[in-house]
Amino acid sequence: HPQTVTRLALLDIVPTRTVYTQVSKNLATWYFHWFFLIQPEPLPEMLLGGHAEPFLRNFAFRGLIPHAIAEPVFAEYLRCFANPQTVHAMCEDYRAGASIDLQHDEADLSTQLACPTLVLWGVHGAMHRLFDVLETWRPRAPAAQGKALPAGHWLPEECPQELTAALAEFLA
């Protein structure tokens, strides 16, 4: 939507198509949830139901900079994950990413982003370990700029000042 989107910031992500076309053992280990959450309903929902705390502590927030998420904030994540509709919506988002979103990506492969694009990722995260993050965006956003921040995947929680400064400069 070039008439609407004038600037784009991408946080610790590579194109979905890149993830699915460049699967490796390391990617599958770090990003197994991409393959687990796309399984047909109700399997992921059923397995996650009632198990939000171990899922969040041992997987979703693994590699997180210590104390980046305060206990009251973690409690809010738990509250949200206790709602079966939240878990179902999360699974549906990943299911769309592996189906209709990929179809749209294939149809748009030759389209390049015209707006200024900022790509930020965590130097301690899986994306940094597995990909040249900025280069994965070059075919779609040739003028993209970006850098690694001192974080894992959770940039807003792990390095809020650095993220805010980078976004403020980019959006000014």
Regions found by a protein language model. Give the residues of each.
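Catalytic histidine-centered segment of alpha/beta-hydrolase-like enzymes
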Residues: 152-164
